[in-house]
């Protein structure tokens, strides 16, 4: 509901009307071409294995067809997995939330979560500062070099793959204040391909 309201308010602010279709990602696997009629794709937060392959295919379709894409939280994570599979040629790339034995854990547990079994009490929660790199789409959107965003997640991008991703055309334009965690991804050569680890909401 909040995503619907945000999109409608954004459209209204620029004098546009918007039509929103909710699509079950479980139904995407063999029908990804049905997305070609859309002017933009937004993948909101989520978790688990259900529909994950459909999301990965959706992110790849948006990238290949130059369709604007915004991935939020899980949509950020699986956009990175999709890029690893289809651009970096790591065919088994995945999130360890989905496949714990993958040889290419693009998304992995936060270091402090390793061995934690109390899922509800182990999330990374609350507001955290994010440094936004200059001359990026993210910086143009926020208009500042530091932002504060709320978080709610246990998994994050594996920085082992940072240089490889950059060499293939995906950069991380926002990172935690410590520089340890990647918060915003984008493809500079794409019309608009952005993912954010945090929910982009008011504090």
Regions found by a protein language model. Give the residues of each.
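N-terminal beta1-alpha1 cap of cysteine-dependent amidohydrolase-like domains
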Residues: 1-146, 151-189, 197-203
């Amino acid at each position: 509901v909040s995503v619907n309201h945000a999109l409608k308010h954004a459209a209204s602010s620029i004098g546009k009307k918007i039509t929103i279709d909710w699509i079950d990602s479980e139904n995407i696997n063999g029908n990804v071409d049905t997305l070609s009629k859309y002017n933009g794709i937004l993948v909101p937060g989520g978790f688990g294995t259900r529909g994950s392959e459909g999301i990965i295919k959706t992110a790849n379709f948006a990238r290949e067809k130059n369709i604007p894409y915004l991935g939020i939280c899980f949509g950020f994570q699986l956009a990175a997995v999709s890029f690893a599979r289809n651009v970096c040629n790591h065919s088994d790339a995945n999130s360890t939330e989905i496949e714990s034995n993958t040889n290419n854990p693009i998304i992995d547990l936060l270091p402090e979560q390793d061995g934690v079994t109390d899922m509800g009490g182990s999330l990374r929660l609350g507001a955290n500062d994010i440094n936004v790199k200059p001359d990026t789409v993210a910086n143009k959107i926020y208009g500042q070099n530091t932002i504060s965003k709320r978080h709610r997640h246990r998994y994050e991008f594996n920085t082992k793959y940072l240089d490889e991703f950059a060499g293939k055309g995906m950069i991380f334009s926002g990172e935690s204040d410590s520089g340890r965690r990647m918060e915003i991804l984008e493809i500079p050569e794409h019309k608009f391909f952005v993912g954010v680890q945090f929910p982009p909401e008011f504090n």
